[in-house]
Amino acid sequence: MPAPGRGPRGPLLSMPGRRGALREPADFGSSLGAALALLLLLLPACCPVKAQNDTEPIVLEGKCLVVCDSSPSGDGAVTSSLGISVRSGSAKVAFSATRSTNHEPSEMSNRTMTIYFDQVLVNIGNHFDLASSIFVAPRKGIYSFSFHVVKVYNRQTIQVSLMQNGYPVISAFAGDQDVTREAASNGVLLLMEREDKVHLKLERGNLMGGWKYSTFSGFLVFPL
């Protein structure tokens, strides 16, 4: 009978790698699982993921792209689904009004001394009211205004003021007694808040001779 540790033809060879070989299947499975987990983690960063609708984030090459559903608001701004307000380039405001006749001022004009107009040439946005001859700002911004008020067959000096919310901002005068037609003209840039009002007021003199061809114009230069 062979002695312990010896084979029939010699000593048994020790196999130090045998136990390692027995563990090899378990080590291979652990490595494969870790590789699969890493692949799953890296998959969204290298492959596009299709969104279910237009407002969900889209992951592409490790960056998050947001598609916003935007719509214009009442004041001309565009508000996205994230609440970001962007001014719309298509929001324009402009008006120009004129006198087409020499009719005498109405009772309303005599009381308030508002210089009113009877014909609108341009009214983009409809923010100039012809009946009251008052312009109402639709939004905060820088506005340009100009006026040209003609007095006819009147030897009195007239003073015309552009009024913002009831207060005079600029004035113009016409008082040459040697001409039958003369105009008081001026222009200005104004910072206006939303709902601010602008109109023309006759501060001095009268327009009893008529004021045909007088004009009042304004437009939004840019919003703020």
Swiss-Prot record:
It is found in: Secreted. Pfam families: C1q. Residues 88-224 form the C1q domain. Brain (cerebellum), adrenal gland and spleen. In the adrenal gland, expressed at high levels in the zona glomerulosa and at low levels in the zona fasciculata-reticularis. Residues 1-51 form the signal peptide. Glycans are attached at residues 53, 110. Gene3D superfamilies: 2.60.120.40. SMART domains: C1Q. GO terms for cellular component: extracellular space; glutamatergic synapse; synapse; synaptic cleft; trans-synaptic protein complex. Its main location: secreted. PANTHER family: CEREBELLIN-2, CEREBELLIN-RELATED. Acts as a synaptic organizer in specific subsets of neurons in the brain. Essential for long-term maintenance but not establishment of excitatory synapses. Functions as part of a trans-synaptic complex by binding to postsynaptic GRID1 and presynaptic neurexins. This interaction helps regulate the activity of NMDA and AMPA receptors at hippocampal synapses without affecting synapse formation. NRXN1B-CBLN2-GRID1 complex transduce presynaptic signals into postsynaptic NMDAR response. NRXN3B-CBLN2-GRID1 complex transduce presynaptic signals into postsynaptic AMPAR response. This is Cerebellin-2. It comes from Rattus norvegicus (Rat).
